[in-house]
């Protein structure tokens, strides 16, 4: 089986994530896309008002009608700071006989040499770079594949900011995720009284 790995905070998961997963299915002839929510990513802070449980619930809602997309909670179970090299080690144990592809955006790829043990990553899995912010391909000495995907110019941080400022986000999120955010008052300004 050909399996693509998409790690991220998914805070919140949005249509850009789902669209990229669909593009990956098509462009790389992928049988399964596995979303791996990070516990505490090494490269960013997570809003403490949104729990790991909230992020996983939103992912479940976003993927409920997708038959090739699944969630793996290996990073959550391991806890602590999440490093991709450790995630890959965990995933390779579960999918020993499968061809694995790690998908990262070019925004992360531009600093790939600063990741923990990047050479080990590219030696153990196919690294696939998706366009996220750059139209041209970035050069690197690390072995990788570039895909010519459509760029959907949205981000989770932009969605959080729009919610805080009362701006519409309904077409940026799967409906179930939008409803979950509203029902749980996520990302809204907290007023101290």
Curated annotation (Swiss-Prot):
InterPro entries: Cyt_trans-like (IPR004821), NadD/NMNAT (IPR005248), Rossmann-like_a/b/a_fold (IPR014729)
Catalysis performed (reactions): nicotinate beta-D-ribonucleotide + ATP + H(+) = deamido-NAD(+) + diphosphate
Keywords: ATP-binding, NAD, Nucleotide-binding, Nucleotidyltransferase, Pyridine nucleotide biosynthesis, Transferase
Annotated CDD domains: NMNAT
Stored Pfam families: CTP_transf_like
Pathway assigned to this chain's UniProt record: Cofactor biosynthesis; NAD(+) biosynthesis; deamido-NAD(+) from nicotinate D-ribonucleotide: step 1/1
GO BP field: NAD biosynthetic process
Family under the similarity heading: Belongs to the NadD family.
PANTHER family according to UniProt: NICOTINATE-NUCLEOTIDE ADENYLYLTRANSFERASE-RELATED, PHOSPHOPANTETHEINE ADENYLYLTRANSFERASE
Function: Catalyzes the reversible adenylation of nicotinate mononucleotide (NaMN) to nicotinic acid adenine dinucleotide (NaAD).
Name by which UniProt lists this protein: Probable nicotinate-nucleotide adenylyltransferase
